[in-house]
UniProtKB/Swiss-Prot annotation:
InterPro entries reported for this sequence: Formyl_transferase-like_C_sf (IPR011034), MPG (IPR003180), MPG_sf (IPR036995)
Example of a GO MF term: alkylbase DNA N-glycosylase activity
Designated name of the protein: Putative 3-methyladenine DNA glycosylase
Entry's EC annotation: 3.2.2.-
Family statement drawn from the similarity comment of this UniProt entry: Belongs to the DNA glycosylase MPG family.
Superkingdom assignment: Bacteria
HAMAP family linked: 3MGH
Source species of the chain: Granulibacter bethesdensis (strain ATCC BAA-1260 / CGDNIH1)
Pfam families in the cross-refs: Pur_DNA_glyco (PF02245)
Amino acid sequence: MKDCPDSLPVTSTGVPDGFWTRPVTEIARDLVGMTLLVDGCGGVIVETEAYDRDDPASHSFSGLTRRNASMFGLPGHAYVYRSYGIHWCFNIVCGPVPGGAVLIRALHPMFGLEAMQLRRGAIRLRDLCRGPGRLCQALGITDGMDGLSLCRPPFDLQPCHKTGEASDLIAAGPRIGITRAIETPWRFYQAESVFVSGSRSSRFLINKAGK
């Protein structure tokens, strides 16, 4: 990843200019199939959820607070928060206006498997990064990474990686674990992936071009 000044929205060799300032739903869809590494551990993103400032389910809906401050920061930076006081959740700040983010819900683990298994315990590969809490534990993501740029270490985000699954076939449906806007189909995932955290019953199927 090339170095990026803190004063500008980040870009990388795998993420074109303007990628992070588009509508959050487009970004959430396009992140599916990309490779995310944290200190060399990670894999292919197979599930995401989009949230924006006008979304009643979003942390930013009621405005800026100490907890959600990173959501109002620069696009292409991390927003990490603790869910239910138990586990960390990793989001990427994005969107055309402040207050948007995409939650990374699940990965197909491919790199640094031994280190991730040590963090998570001796479990089967399918459950290593299936769900936002498990994902953060496996990758070693904590609130110490909140606000960091995705353009520099420990993060590395790269273009699509072949997993042997139908990565171009993406499903969209309602998000998981929320109490507002529960019917909004802003969850995106690889339709055939066994590493997806929630139900694979979709509202509709789209491809990488959004068709």
